[in-house]
Amino acid sequence: MNRQQLEGRIDIAPRTPGVYLMKDAAGKILYVGKAKNLKSRTRAYFSGTDSRAMIPFLVSRIHDIEFILTETEKEALILENNLIKEHHPRYNICFRDDKAYFNIRADLNEPFPRFQLVRRPRKDGAKYFGPYPSSASARETLQFLQSIFPLRTCRDAELKSRTRPCLEYQIKRCLAPCVGRINSEDYLQMVRDGVSFLEGRGNNLLRELRERMKMAAEQMNYEEAAFLRDRIRAIEETLERQRMVSMTFKDQDIFGLYREGHLIQVCILLIRQGKILGSRLLPLLKFEGETADMLSSLLMQYYDQSVDIPQEILIPASIEDRQVIREWLEEKRGKGLSILIPRKGRGLELLHIAEQNAEHGFKMERKSLDDSDESLRLLMERLHLRRFPRKIEAFDISNIGGRLAVAAMVTFQDGRPLKSGYRRFRIRTVHGADDYAMMYEALKRRYQGKENLPDLIVVDGGKGQLAVAFSLLKDLSISGQDVIGLAKERVNGVTVQGGVNKSEDRVYLPHKKEALYLSRWPAVLFLLQRIRDEAHRFAVSYHRSLKTRSDFMSLLDDIPGVGEVRKKALLLSFGDLARIREATVEELTQVEGIGKDLGEKIHAFLHNDQRSVEPSTG
């Protein structure tokens, strides 16, 4: 479609809200935008009235425009966000965070709730707190909660089946609701106290605890008063360590940006009840447009993934869609909020803190990327690769004598793990211990569609596995693809010509008889070893999980009266065979479908059976 045809399509575009998709000659989406008035918005791209720096580059590539009409501007905003996440257009900002940050979860609808760490919040009616800036901070918070609010940490199955208190009760880290040592009302009060602390209402909680301590002392319940006193002291010490930055006691997210060219680092300062809880550095973003456009899309994508939306969001620049985004966030949050651009005072000071953190994060990230680029450049040079190995995919096989065979693929982008690119394969067509055939199957299943090919394929193994990979690429008519084999150390203490120890990892290249040793280039060797080891870890963990489940199922197959339904019920309740061995008859009979007679049979069988139930070590 030429320029005249494009302008003709725009002339008949509706003057209603909606989304427009700009595509190149191959039909690939270059840019997704939203508009209150589709006709006037898209016309600006070709009339010269849109002064954004990216517009000439974008317009020169547009061959088609597609329109999707919506009822309201807010619907257009939501649809735009969904399309960007689905298609990742080049000229849109695309926030993709492969980290799964920890949240703390508590379901207050349960009779005896517990606090637990989860990675992905769900819409299940529970309360979620987070995400925490690091796993260490999340675990530290959970440990603190458990030290001053002695709630259960056990799974639901253990809570229902236990007949005597566990060790946690003995060391005063749990009040044993499993055996009725605390009633539901008192237990829930302690959970609510923990929730108050997580919500940042520590001062309110302290006032309430002091009142309850005073009342307990007046009633001569000195044990309860002492218990409350210790909790008060622990909370006071924690609150003293938190820096008060605002006397308004508000919950705020403050977005600081640092930009060099197309690269943008974002730091979010997390403030709850006027105190800095921490900061969160987002992955380095690449965006060719204006900062204001980036901010709109970033707010949509960031809060679309979050369950923790504060009452104030501070941003460094004005955005066109602020009102619509605010309405969308209020709907998600269930109450009002503000999106502000601070011009003076404490808000501006906090924004500067966030921006300084963003700049520091950018420089650290840039140095890391520069180091990775140097390692990748050396890798390309030493191995004579055709392309710069920005995207690398590595494969490993795991099995025991051909049993429960699996393959794993890991992806590294710019020298770093890209978890969204990991894949696991349960080997389907190979019977017996044939690692070569297993590798062929895994490679075929990954590359037969010829989509999103990497710059480099790494297979774990020597000449044989490399030959398999090379053969597979030939069978699929994939040419020009770099592939190498990385063999683990085999022989110790044997020196070959040139003084190279043969115990070193060896790299095998197509059409080369001799292996290449990389000890002279430690950065390259370390990178390849890290990739190989991650593929091995991923494969072994998958195989181990399958083996544990298989051992569990096969052992229970020998018990009369235990079929598939009861096996699954036992697995769901106890998790693994070792826990079932530890269970009493009474605990076994708590599982649905298992009465006293069958529980006794299972208990007797497991304690007479001598087969190992230890998990595979790979």
Curated annotation (Swiss-Prot):
Organism: Syntrophus aciditrophicus (strain SB)
Stored CDD domains: GIY-YIG_UvrC_Cho
Organism placement in taxonomy: Bacteria, Pseudomonadati, Thermodesulfobacteriota, Syntrophia, Syntrophales
The protein's assembly and partners: Interacts with UvrB in an incision complex.
Domain GIY-YIG intervals: 15-93
InterPro entries on file: DisA/LigA_HHH (IPR041663), GIY-YIG_endonuc (IPR000305), GIY-YIG_endonuc_sf (IPR035901), GIY-YIG_UvrC_Cho (IPR047296), Hlx-hairpin-Hlx_DNA-bd_motif (IPR003583), RuvA_2-like (IPR010994), UVR_dom (IPR001943), UVR_dom_sf (IPR036876)
GO molecular function, one term: excinuclease ABC activity
Domain UVR: 203-238
Family (UniProt): Belongs to the UvrC family.
The name this protein goes by in its record: UvrABC system protein C
Keywords: Cytoplasm, DNA damage, DNA excision, DNA repair, Excision nuclease, SOS response
Primary residence: cytoplasm
Role summary: The UvrABC repair system catalyzes the recognition and processing of DNA lesions. UvrC both incises the 5' and 3' sides of the lesion. The N-terminal half is responsible for the 3' incision and the C-terminal half is responsible for the 5' incision.
